[in-house]
Amino acid sequence: MAAQKSLELLTGREREVAVGVGCGQSNADIAAHLHMSEATVKAHVSRVLAKLNAANRVQLAITMHDAGLA
């Protein structure tokens, strides 16, 4: 499964942020849940989108859902 192999490229923290996006959480919600700044969440989301070749949060959420992580 291509999505699963792509997810292996993510760091643990990137994966946690991606799960939050997949669950429909805002950057502020993810930041509060993971005890990090909103700017850090935004940076993680940008890196995750690039690593997974996703154009936007919706594509990322679909990827996470398809992988059973959201």
Please provide the spans of the model-predicted regions:
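Short amphipathic helical patch at the helix-1/turn junction of helix-turn-helix
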Residues: 20-22, 39, 65
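Recognition helix of helix-turn-helix DNA-binding domains
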Residues: 24-59
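N-terminal regulatory/sensing modules of transcriptional regulators
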Residues: 1-7, 33, 68-70
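Hydrophobic patch in the ABC ATPase nucleotide-binding domain
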Residues: 10, 54, 69
